[in-house]
Amino acid sequence: MSRRPAVSALCLLLIIAACTSQEGSSSTAAGETTVAATTPLVTDVAELPGRLVVIDDGGNIVTMDPDGSDPAPITEDAGDSAGYRQPTFSPVADTLAWSQITADGTALGSSDGRGGSRMAIPMNAPPFYMYWSPDGNGIGVLHNSAQGTIEFEIVDFAAQSTQVMGSGSPFYFSWSPDSSQVAAHVQFDVFATIDLEGNRSDLGATAEGYQAPHWAPEGIFHLGEDGLELRQEGGEARVLATTPGPVAFVVNRQGTRVAVQSIVAGDQPPGINAAITQTPALPGNAVVVVDVESGQVYEVVDSPSFGLFWSPDGTSLLVLQPIQDGSGEISAMVWRNGEVSEVSTLSPHPAFVEEVLRFFDQYGQSLQLWSPDSSGFALAGAIDDEPGIWVHTIAGGDPVKVAEGSWVSWSNT
């Protein structure tokens, strides 16, 4: 990632394409086989599981139930002398981590879900991105260095220690499922693994036209020289689809589906093309889902998105679609079982746009917007000019404002 004030080239192309593309469509590829979810969807916000962590309108961190009840303050001193950013829950425990700047300096802060067991691990610079390892024992951190580049540092919670593992700008990474190493895409052309001792192994050629790789149980997904590629265990590479331009993609946790959009300037022919090699050619300026096992491609919407986020069960995709009326609003849509439905429209909070949506392919791996049971999701923004934290259920019902605030993330359990 890169924290330069300019919008990334991919996002700039997305904005251009969005202004010239047609409105979204819920059409899907012919012959699609849908898989029905086995868990009934919750329709009442009060019945949703897990906890939310919010940065409230005073800048403090608070956890609460999904309906806003049972709030637990984590910090209470935000202001001129203390600032807190991007709190998230561990994937395996009731533990929080966040970036902080206080009178004691910059640090990675941590506590349990109710503010107990507080600790602060000093850092040389404030983290602007944090990504828990799947086992919850560590966090990969990105922050700026004194040399003007980005440093990648791993925090070991048990030892309360940190170690710089790499540097470069931009810097994107993805944890291996066993938490033993990361796959990194650095300075556009470096593609390598980095283990917990800092040892680097080159993964070979990679393309420039993407940001974050994604390591899933199936292997490492990245943009190769021939298209969207899955590098499997043992080094074998499989091209899933060819792409007409730069891409952003997110893979579900199971590694079975990839949501992809390829951004190109100018008009592109609609639809999905099949190459002679039977490798599908993805359309430009559209969002599609690729089934990893079968290679089938399903069209989600026929215009670019500002953000894509998979549900924990891997069956539903949250699509944040720009509304082309000059209002700055987005449509929160859900693709599920081959169908797209609009859940709400809202104006996303500026912090969410600047910090998350610019890099949604990276945050899609670390930020939990969905409830643990995949029945709902939470967003920070304004609905009908009412700002706050809004919880949505995908089975129906109006979104519910549960708190004031600028940031929200859901626990994993």
Each language-model region and where it sits:
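Sec-dependent bacterial lipoprotein signal peptides
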Residues: M1-A17
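Sequence signature of WD/YWTD-type beta-propeller architectures
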Residues: C19-T413
